């Protein structure tokens, strides 16, 4: 689960609400001045998308990168952090999943120190709470989390979510009419994770059935 990267890219990350963050990340990808970025916000605001997109960007440039989903930490140990300071990019997603666990907090603290000492790694972490609100037990780790730049990811409006749905469909080569897009958007939960999952399901179904995404077809596939 650690290395798996989906089809997220910086190009299909809807950046209008988070332009300052994107600009700063781009600058540090080419000229590493700020090593640490802390991204926070509630679920489905795009944290995972952005972290995976950053990894994809580095990999396409033949640079070393790793994405670690800490909400899957039951499947691996703190040994996952060993030698990560040798990577050019380290993305740690869902930091709140391991906060409060002393073993993980100590391992995170050690990783921060190694990355800081080495000076060649861009470290980007995400969490649902701000650095000051995260219930960290280890005081030294709490101070490390305030080292770099902190950004709250701003949620998309409904209009922006609908635009992203259409954009994602276009990038997948899916013919999605405005009528069908509006139908999907009004019938499903309006979070991007749900909408993306539905789009992937519809993409596979339409290819297998060789059908266009009409409203009746969407109804049958999504059980609406």
List PLM regions with ranges.
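AAA+/P-loop NTPase substrate/partner-engagement loops
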Residues: 60-89
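Dynamic helix-loop-helix/coil hinge segments at AAA+ ATPase domain boundaries and subdomain interfaces
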Residues: 2-22
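Conserved nucleotide-sensing/catalytic segment adjacent to the nucleotide-binding pocket
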Residues: 79-125
């Amino acid at each position: 689960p650690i290395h798996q990267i989906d089809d997220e890219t910086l190009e299909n990350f809807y950046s209008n609400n988070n332009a300052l963050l994107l600009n700063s990340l781009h600058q540090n990808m080419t000229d590493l001045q700020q090593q640490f970025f802390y991204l926070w916000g509630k679920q489905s605001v795009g944290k995972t998308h952005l972290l995976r997109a950053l990894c994809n960007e580095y990999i396409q440039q033949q640079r070393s990168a790793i994405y670690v989903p800490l909400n899957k930490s039951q499947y691996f140990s703190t040994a996952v952090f060993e030698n990560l300071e040798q990577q050019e990019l380290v993305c740690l997603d869902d930091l709140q999943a391991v906060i409060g666990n002393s073993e993980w907090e100590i391992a995170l603290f050690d990783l921060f120190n190694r990355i800081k000492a080495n000076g060649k790694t861009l470290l980007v972490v995400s969490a649902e709470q701000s650095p000051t609100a995260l219930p960290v037990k280890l005081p030294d780790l709490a101070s490390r989390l305030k080292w770099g730049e902190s950004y709250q990811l701003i949620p998309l409006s409904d209009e922006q979510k609908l635009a992203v749905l259409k954009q994602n469909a276009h990038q997948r080569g899916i013919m999605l009419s405005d009528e069908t897009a509006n139908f999907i958007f009004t019938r499903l939960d309006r979070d991007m994770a749900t909408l993306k999952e539905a789009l992937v399901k519809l993409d596979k179904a339409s290819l297998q059935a060789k059908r266009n995404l009409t409203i009746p077809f969407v109804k049958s596939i999504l059980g609406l």
